[in-house]
Curated annotation (Swiss-Prot):
Keywords annotated in UniProt: Stress response
Membrane spanning stretches: none
Keyword match Transferase: no
Domain of life: Eukaryota
Organism phylogeny: Eukaryota, Viridiplantae, Streptophyta, Embryophyta, Tracheophyta
Protein name: Late embryogenesis abundant protein Lea5-D
Similarity comment: Belongs to the LEA type 3 family.
Induction info: By water stress; in leaves.
Low complexity bias locations: 57-67
Annotated organism of origin: Gossypium hirsutum (Upland cotton)
Region (Disordered), start-end ranges: 48-67
Gene Ontology biological-process entries: response to stress
Length: 105
């Protein structure tokens, strides 16, 4: 009886370890799982709504690409994005943010 209990413990532990390794192991797959493609019906099929959304996203990304044009920096002359804010020196920023009031007691 004691021998069967100890062998059951070893068998259970080995099964648990194998299950844990298979769950925790990470892998890479080039193709999506069958459940993902099955949820969309035929693989590669797109409905009108999905096509319309995809077209909106692509057109908005094109306008974003054109809105971030590069322009010469008036101070340095080097090119930088137009929508970039002015740089500030760390010492000047520290001086603005810290209050240097002297407390009288």
């Amino acid at each position: 009886m004691a021998r069967s209990v100890s062998s059951f413990k070893l068998l259970g532990a080995s099964i648990f370890d194998g299950l844990y390794v298979s769950i925790s192991r990470r892998g890479y797959s080039g193709a999506p799982p069958a459940a993902v493609t099955a949820s969309f019906g035929r693989p590669g099929a797109m409905g009108k709504v999905e096509r319309r959304d995809a077209m909106k996203e692509s057109s908005s990304s094109e306008t974003r690409a054109y809105s971030s044009a590069w322009a010469p920096d008036p101070v340095t002359g080097y090119y930088r994005p137009e929508n970039c804010g002015a740089e500030i020196d760390a010492a000047e920023l520290r001086e603005m943010l810290l209050n240097h009031r002297v407390r009288s007691q």
